[in-house]
């Protein structure tokens, strides 16, 4: 594992962030299995963990594991809250929701602060003023060290930071959109923001110019880049991955990128998801990809991707042929 430092956080962050949104991490009957997976991830060097208020028992499982292992002082927690607009979620986008959900999350996580606090979704009809004010209060109280937005557009992030600068406050210093070699053809949850695709080039340029840390989710396109199915038809997609990523990503442009990733992986003697991660890490955006491997081999493969070097030409070819 490789590590990096971020201003305002006095411990190293792992180059890869461990995502905890899957059913394997929801506690209950899965709790012991989740602890074993977390132990393997820790041994592999993961120190940054992504969770959210909307992950239900996931926060409790992560908090219990960190406490039982005595790891909290070394771990970096990225927590998310306030999730308006997602299908099945009735969160109200307000300063009150931000505070109430963070404080509930802190109790579940068995901690008095999180290093990174990310607003899960946005409601562009609501002015950013009160939200920025509340986040600054939470930072002043020591409950968050840095904050930002997940599914927030560039325009709304800039609006938040413009308000903060005009009022002598701290603005967003981190974002967490989706990003991978392939791009959405269907928004899975509603209100999602991704960096992939030509339309998002201005956002990528802005993030690169400002070198704002980006903790990108769906870095393997929810399994579309897992290598479980083959574009030559020998392993049909419908038999190998869930229907959701098929609906979200399966289109000719993405099939072509996956086919090129398969070819390059074969040439380099590695796995397709390693090519996808290596491509991400070659981008000029200041990325911390979120991954969720749940087996020893997959955990090892993800970490090994950090050592895989791609040339500019290879990265361009993967994207555009």
Protein language model features and the residues they cover:
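N-terminal binding-site loop/beta-alpha segment at the start of enzyme catalytic domains
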Residues: 1-76, 140
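Conserved beta-strand positions
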Residues: 18, 51, 79, 116-119, ...
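Active-site mouth loops of central-metabolism enzymes
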Residues: 21-32, 84-96, 120, 125
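Short, acidic/polar
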Residues: 29-41, 93-109, 158-162
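A short, structured active-site edge motif that brings together acidic residues
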Residues: 73-86, 175-179
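Active-site groove signature of glycoside hydrolases
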Residues: 106-127
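Beta/alpha (TIM)-barrel catalytic core signal, keyed to glycine-rich beta->alpha loops juxtaposed to Asp/Glu
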Residues: 128-321
